[in-house]
Amino acid sequence: MARDQKDHYYRKAKEEGYRARSAYKLKQINDKFHIIRRGSRVVDLGAAPGGWLQVARELSGGIVVGVDLERIEPLEGIVTIQGDITKEETLEQIAAALGGQADVVISDAAPNLSGIWDVDHARSIDLSRAALRIAKRLLRPGGSFLVKVFQGDMFNDYLEEVKREFSSVHAYTPPASRKESAEIYVIGKKLLSAPVRSGEIYDVTVDSVGRTGDGIAMIQGFAVIVKNASPGERLRIKIGPVKQRFAFASILERL
């Protein structure tokens, strides 16, 4: 507590009526990446005590839903749900409160700390993976995701998992994070609705040629652009960057 009382953001939160100093982390992240906009429908996973909920409501002015195992003291204009985010019934409650799909899913949740770094890092990754799974269920195509992760040897693998699901992904530590903290925030923008993901391998037939002269193969109605390919060719391809409306691929083998 003594450290908190000397902390600039702790004092600022008290003065400005935020429930936690972490409110400024969300403000700073949103200033840089613009994930919450006016009218955004926002879900906050692990929302207690509610600092992020307060900021999300200010930024959005729309529907904001907070979920936590602990009871969240009521906040005006915000729906709070006490429940386990891994349970189907909780997800149904969230969907009902939203009245549709979310535009943004955020999570500043942290695991119960053991003091053993490898254990705490692994627990953080597990929690972040759970948040990603839930975000994929709740978000509309093109929606955004923000989650806190502890840095460590599994972080890069997790970052790659997020990159497979979103068109644009960033890792960022806001100024309000304590200098001694190992936390970092992962931001995913534009949730992909494509039936393919980067790194996947497919056998395809090139259907046509695009304006740039590259071959185009269709996978479940989704266009995949293949360089140096001609119509009628049968190819084994590896998916590269995936966009909202198309993907790129490289040729592994001509069949």
Curated annotation (Swiss-Prot):
Limits of the TRAM domain: 195-253
GO molecular function, one term: rRNA (uridine-2'-O-)-methyltransferase activity
Enzyme class, spelled out: transferase
Documented EC number(s): 2.1.1.166
Alphabetical keyword list: Cytoplasm, Methyltransferase, rRNA processing, S-adenosyl-L-methionine, Transferase
One GO CC annotation: cytoplasm
List of catalytic residues: 148 (proton acceptor)
Catalysis performed (reactions): uridine(2552) in 23S rRNA + S-adenosyl-L-methionine = 2'-O-methyluridine(2552) in 23S rRNA + S-adenosyl-L-homocysteine + H(+)
The organism's place on the tree of life at top rank: Archaea
Residues where S-adenosyl-L-methionine binds: 50, 52, 68, 84, 108
Subcellular location: Cytoplasm
Primary localization class, coarse: cytoplasm
Function as written in the Swiss-Prot or TrEMBL entry: Specifically methylates the uridine in position 2552 of 23S rRNA at the 2'-O position of the ribose in the fully assembled 50S ribosomal subunit.
Family, as annotated: Belongs to the class I-like SAM-binding methyltransferase superfamily. RNA methyltransferase RlmE family.
The protein's name in its UniProt record: Ribosomal RNA large subunit methyltransferase E
Lineage of origin: Archaea, Methanobacteriati, Methanobacteriota, Stenosarchaea group, Methanomicrobia
